[in-house]
């Protein structure tokens, strides 16, 4: 398999992950399974889509904040995506952090 074929395969995989996360979010929402899980799946749909895009870039990293930062710098600030896209990605990240780790944040604040 060539490098380009490997990249194409990884892009397809990441986009399939994004689609699955969207489908999961819709199912959870429609079946009243809890907003926390819906927020998580929506964020991950966005994150996987960004990871698919970054396969085409010289980006190395896996931390969510690094991925989002690179996306905003390279694609939003350069006008490839509108500012709202970066804003929504940041909001989804913050909402996912809060919903997934709220209990942890509350314990830290009590200390």
Predicted regions, residues:
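Terminal alpha-helical segments
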Residues: 1-111
């Amino acid at each position: 398999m060539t490098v380009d074929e490997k990249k194409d395969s990884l892009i397809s995989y990441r986009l399939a992950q994004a689609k699955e996360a969207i489908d999961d979010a819709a199912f959870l929402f429609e079946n009243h399974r809890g907003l926390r899980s819906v927020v998580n799946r929506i964020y991950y749909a966005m994150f996987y889509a960004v990871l698919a895009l970054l396969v085409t870039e010289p980006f190395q990293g896996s931390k969510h904040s690094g991925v989002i930062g690179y996306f905003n710098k390279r694609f939003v600030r350069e006008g490839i995506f509108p500012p709202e896209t970066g804003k929504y990605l940041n909001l989804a990240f913050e909402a996912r952090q809060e919903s997934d780790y709220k209990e942890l944040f509350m314990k830290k604040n009590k200390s």
